[in-house]
């Protein structure tokens, strides 16, 4: 007798390359991210047959290649702010970047890309990451990949390098701004006062 048996929770729904599934209490629905640049909402109902497309990034931004994560601001009910992280192609040589952006969600449950505001970017390629989560402290936590191919591992030698943003966890405050930045580096981050280190690294 098997110890467990897998069953489809939503047998009527099909997705392509799903990479993230979260419960969004603000919508009273599940929120699912497809790698191919779409974000869906659907009811917590085994009989659900359709979804609401909250975001179709590639339709609006052809340079976008992948969406990895999508999350709502802790005060979303008041400010309608959401955050996404995606890859984009920089030029015809297919060099890429990874971008975290803020945008507004309309009352009709559509991402308004005209409100997009870039928060932070880093080089893309290979392992890009990434996941976004707000902590109980209200800070935005961002996981980043090492931006290189799997073989050899950590080809850019960035895994233990805190002088860049790659291969780590970042912690930033999106409700305030430092001069020249679209965010604030929290003063209690561990490497803020270390010469040569990126203060965003957590």
Give, region by region, the residue ranges found by the protein language model.
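Short glycine- and Lys/Arg-enriched binding-loop motifs that mark or flank ligand-binding interfaces
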Residues: 141, 155, 163, 192
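Peri-membrane helix termini and adjoining interfacial loops of integral membrane proteins
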Residues: 113, 179-189
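Active-site rim elements
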Residues: 155-159, 196-202
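Short glycine/proline- and charge-enriched loop/turn segments
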Residues: 52, 148-153, 189-197
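Acidic, Gly/Ser/Thr-rich repeat motifs that build Ca2+-stabilized beta-propeller blades
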Residues: 1-151
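Beta-propeller blade signature
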Residues: 97-108, 157-175
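Conserved small-residue
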Residues: 174-177, 185, 196
């Amino acid at each position: 007798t098997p110890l467990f048996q897998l069953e489809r929770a939503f047998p009527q729904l099909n997705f392509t390359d799903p990479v993230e599934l979260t419960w969004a209490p603000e919508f009273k629905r599940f929120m699912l991210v497809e790698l191919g640049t779409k974000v869906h909402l659907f009811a917590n109902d085994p009989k659900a047959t359709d979804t609401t497309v909250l975001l179709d990034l590639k339709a609006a931004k052809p340079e976008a290649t992948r969406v990895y994560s999508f999350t709502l601001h802790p005060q979303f009910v008041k400010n309608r702010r959401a955050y996404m992280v995606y890859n984009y192609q920089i030029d015809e040589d297919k060099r890429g970047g990874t971008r975290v952006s803020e945008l507004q969600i309309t009352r009709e449950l559509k991402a308004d890309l005209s409100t997009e505001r870039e928060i932070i970017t880093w080089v893309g390629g290979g392992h890009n990451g990434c996941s976004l989560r707000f902590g109980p402290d209200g800070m935005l936590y961002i996981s980043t990949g090492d931006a290189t191919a799997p073989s050899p591992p950590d080809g850019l030698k960035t895994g233990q390098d805190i002088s860049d943003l790659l291969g780590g966890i970042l912690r930033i405050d999106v409700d305030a701004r430092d001069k020249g930045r679209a965010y604030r580096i929290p003063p209690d981050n561990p490497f803020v006062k270390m010469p040569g280190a990126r203060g965003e690294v957590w």
